From Swiss-Prot:
One of its GO terms (molecular function) is ATP hydrolysis activity. The modification Phosphoserine is found at S3. It catalyses: ATP + H2O = ADP + phosphate + H(+). Necessary for the fragmentation of Golgi stacks during mitosis and for their reassembly after mitosis. Involved in the formation of the nuclear envelope, and of the transitional endoplasmic reticulum (tER). The transfer of membranes from the endoplasmic reticulum to the Golgi apparatus occurs via 50-70 nm transition vesicles which derive from part-rough, part-smooth transitional elements of the endoplasmic reticulum (tER). Vesicle budding from the tER is an ATP-dependent process. Residues 779-794 have a biased composition (Gly residues). Residues 768-778 have a biased composition (Low complexity). It comes from Danio rerio. Homohexamer. Keywords: ATP-binding, Autophagy, Cell cycle, Cytoplasm, DNA damage, DNA repair, Endoplasmic reticulum, Hydrolase, Lipid-binding, Nucleotide-binding, Nucleus, Phosphoprotein, Transport. Belongs to the AAA ATPase family. It is an enzyme of class 3 (hydrolase). This is Transitional endoplasmic reticulum ATPase. Its main location: cytoplasm.
Length: 806
């Protein structure tokens, strides 16, 4: 029942986006005949709309564009489609599959005169009379309807020329009859100016903010188009919208699109531009902007970067800012009821804006334009790639799923990076010096999935630009042993990201934190790196001591900032290395920077509790001094899973040696199992060191051999023909034996005993090893026994503890 209610509310909140079905709304289809002023409908649809063959119709497309055409019937056209060629589609700013509306336009007059101009790059090098060759045959006996602002293409004399209708009399549309005067004198129109108007932003150029767009539409379009609605209900239409969100999510873009689509007068104020050095001038600039807008109502005033001109008045020391804020307040209250002026503002720091501006009646609607989710990212990618040539193997959905935390701007950068990579591959065929590029090369360009993969490896979400994170290329294979721990970690991070529905089903929020502890050199940091790489989440690594700075209160601010960034780029793994440096037990250290360390811990504790459950942020801590860590941070709900990472046992040691020597050539007689048996009590780092040293010895021998051979060659040139094989093809047994002479244990038995004791006490104080429910019947107790026993063994490797002493 509840879910039904929610979905109903969703429908209402986006109700304004739904297309109403009317008989005159048709879907654009490719035309068969190439005539620029003909659209064709099915006969049934023409009867329904009461149109006749040869009638003039008015077509309305996107971005308030309209044009006039002649309608003909076409039997092959289905009822809900309309056929038009590319020229008409461009004039309406629509693509195939978009929806346009069509209505009869009976009162089109014959034109007295029209003025058309060619577009410069299509008439280069044409000699002769444009009018005679192109325009006269095009308009002769055709009675074409045209509209001011249309562009049409005329073929003739071996090439095609594009013309733009600059003026018609009577305006805005007329039919070109035999006695209409056609002017085509004047400077040709530059293609750039045309392209700019073509590239205006519309609603369909914005992806990933469907709900917010609906809110904005009902705030802007309803009052501007149908003010009577609000009068009938008896409320004042809302007047201010504040868009806020992280940079790059499309706040300014939305405002532009609204301006283009509503056709209202649009007045852009860039925040800092208003400021002036003369006293009183800044305020008068603001007043002028509002007066201008009221004259041209309905109008939209858009203030970009609002936090520059309306900061909190208590915080600013400048007199000017205060006066500007006051002026803005009075102006927004003084907008007359009748004047349909809407004020929109954008900022990415909504909390630094004066609170008086955020009350109802000024900026009464605050629309949070957040970081898009996977479906939103897919929409954005489709918009950015709709003009790109994509190869067949490109799977945009997968790209959308992998780009966690990317905003629209990052995705745009990603697409252009992929396209550049595609061009680089063809670089050997392109010569920069040439005037033109081969058509073959141009046509063979296409962006493949590999290009996207490459771009993905290059791109970081902009929320994480400062804490730039190299995602390490370490996989689970690089880590020998520790299988239980690996599984725990995968469950911790991957389940909430990949199966959120399961958590909903069982009604629990996933746990958010893990603490690794154990002797140094056992792979705690390595595990965190591997998890960052394996589960497509973003990864922020925080080295403990970095957080502390000399300024009072700055260390805590650093903590806050890091958690904010992680929330913005969710799903995200926060890895605190050397946690003991920032989370010491409180109260012991007196006089350390005025107790700065204590305050940092308090900040971390509050942040960990305040992780809103919606965001997937995981915290992993690693330390080798678990005894001095503040107990408050170890409670369930913060770092709730304490995982002891012991020294590797024999099985794990074999796995570690194999993982280390995966890429090395080793001779057959090296018995790694025996090596593992002998190196009891060695940590993972010690084993790695043995492998490195053996490798180094082999390299040394190889180099010495080469030098010796070079000498022999110089003394005895006749022996050169004999091609000898590589003297040291692989790491031999004696290299390992030599390396073992230098091997040492980095962790003494004493240390290990400490860790063991700690793990033991934790387990006793925390867990009930022998807990059973009282059995009502024998069948019920069986499975629960087994599972609880297994669980205990998993977390603290009880079975492996004995091997540590050997």
């Amino acid at each position: 029942m509840a879910s039904g209610g929610e979905s109903k509310n969703d429908d209402l909140s986006t109700a304004i986006l739904k297309q109403k079905n009317r008989p005159n709304r048709l879907i654009v289809d490719e035309s068969i005949n190439e005539d620029n002023s003909v659209v064709s409908l099915s006969q049934a649809k023409m009867d329904e709309l009461q149109l006749f063959r040869g009638d003039t119709v008015l077509l309305k497309g996107k971005k308030r564009r309209e044009t006039v055409c002649i309608v003909l019937s076409d039997d092959t056209c289905s009822d809900e489609k309309v056929r038009m060629n590319r020229v008409v589609r461009n004039n309406l700013r629509v693509r195939l599959g978009d929806v346009i509306s069509i209505q009869p336009c009976p009162d089109v007059k014959y034109g007295k005169r029209i003025h058309v101009l060619p577009i410069d790059d299509t008439v280069e090098g044409i000699t002769g009379n444009l009018f005679e060759v192109y325009l006269k045959p095009y308009f002769l006996e055709a009675y074409r309807p045209i509209r001011k602002g249309d562009i049409f293409l005329v073929r003739g004399g071996m090439r095609a020329v594009e013309f733009k209708v600059v003026e018609t009399d009577p305006s805005p549309y007329c039919i070109v009859a035999p006695d209409t005067v056609i002017h085509c004198e004047g400077e040709p129109i530059k293609r750039e100016d045309e392209e700019e108007s073509l590239n205006e932003v519309g609603y369909d150029d914005i992806g990933g903010v469907r709900k917010q767009l609906a809110q904005i539409k009902e705030m802007v379009e309803l009052p501007l188009r149908h003010p009577a609605l609000f009068k009938a209900i008896g409320v004042k239409p809302p007047r201010g919208i504040l868009l806020y969100g992280p940079p790059g999510t499309g706040k300014t873009l939305i405002a532009r699109a609204v301006a283009n689509e509503t056709g209202a007068f649009f007045f852009l104020i860039n925040g800092p531009e208003i400021m002036s050095k003369l006293a009183g001038e800044s305020e008068s600039n603001l007043r002028k902007a509002f007066e201008e807008a009221e004259k041209n109502a309905p109008a939209i005033i858009f203030i970009d970067e609002l936090d520059a001109i309306a900061p909190k008045r208590e915080k600013t020391h400048g007199e000017v800012e205060r006066r500007i804020v006051s002026q803005l307040l009075t102006l927004m209250d003084g907008l007359k009821q009748r004047a349909h002026v809407i004020v929109m503002a954008a900022t990415n720091r909504p909390n630094s804006i004066d609170p008086a501006l955020r009350r109802f009646g000024r900026f009464d609607r605050e629309v949070d334009i957040g970081i898009p989710d996977a479906t939103g990212r897919l929409e954005i990618l489709q918009i950015h790639t709709k003009n790109m040539k994509l190869a067949d193997d490109v799977d945009l959905e997968q790209v959308a799923n992998e780009t966690h935390g990317h905003v629209g701007a990052d995705l745009a950068a990603l697409c252009s990076e992929a396209a550049l990579q595609a061009i680089r591959k063809k670089m050997d065929l392109i010569d920069l010096e040439d005037e033109t590029i081969d058509a073959e090369v141009m046509n063979s360009l296409a962006v493949t999935m590999d290009d996207f993969r490459w771009a993905l490896s290059q791109s970081n979400p902009s929320a994480l630009r400062e804490t730039v994170v190299e995602v390490p290329n370490i996989t689970w294979e690089d880590i020998g042993g520790l299988d239980d721990v690996k599984r725990e970690l995968q469950e911790l991070v991957q389940y909430p990201v990949e199966h959120p529905d399961k958590f909903l089903k069982f009604g629990m929020t996933p746990s958010k934190g893990v603490l690794f502890y154990g002797p140094p050199g056992c792979g705690k940091t390595l595990l965190a790196k591997a998890i960052a790489n394996e589960c497509q989440a973003n990864f922020i690594s925080i080295k403990g001591p970095e957080l502390l700075t000399m300024w009072f209160g700055e260390s805590e601010a650093n903590v806050r900032e890091i958690f904010d960034k992680a929330r913005q780029a969710a799903p995200c793994v926060l890895f605190f290395d050397e946690l003991d440096s920032i989370a010491k037990a409180r109260g012991g250290n007196v006089g350390d920077g005025g107790g700065a360390a204590d305050r940092v811990i308090n900040q971390i504790l509050t942040e960990m509790d305040g992780m809103s459950s919606k965001k997937n942020v995981f915290i992993i801590g690693a330390t080798n001094r678990p005894d001095i860590i503040d107990p408050a941070i170890l409670r369930p709900g913060r770092l709730d899973q304490l995982i002891y990472i012991p020294l590797p046992d024999e099985k794990s040691r074999i796995a570690i040696l194999k993982a280390n020597l995966r890429k090395s050539p080793i001779s057959k007689d090296v018995d790694l199992d025996f090596l593992a048996k002998m190196t009891n009590g060695f940590s993972g780092a010690d084993l790695t060191e043995i492998c490195q040293r053996a490798c180094k010895l082999a390299i040394r021998e190889s180099i010495e051999n080469e030098i010796r051979r070079e000498r022999e060659r110089q003394t005895n040139p006749s022996a050169m023909e004999v091609e000898e094989d590589d003297p040291v093809p692989e790491i031999r047994k004696d290299h390992f034996e030599e390396a073992m002479r230098f091997a040492r244990r980095s962790v003494s038995d004493n240390d290990i005993r400490k860790y063991e004791m700690f793990a033991q006490t934790l387990q006793q104080s925390r867990g009930f090893g022998s807990f059973r429910f009282p059995s009502s019947n024998q069948g019920g107790s069986g499975p629960s026994q087994g599972s609880s026993g297994g669980g205990g063994g998993n977390v603290f490797n009880e079975d492996n503890d004995d091997d540590l002493y050997g």
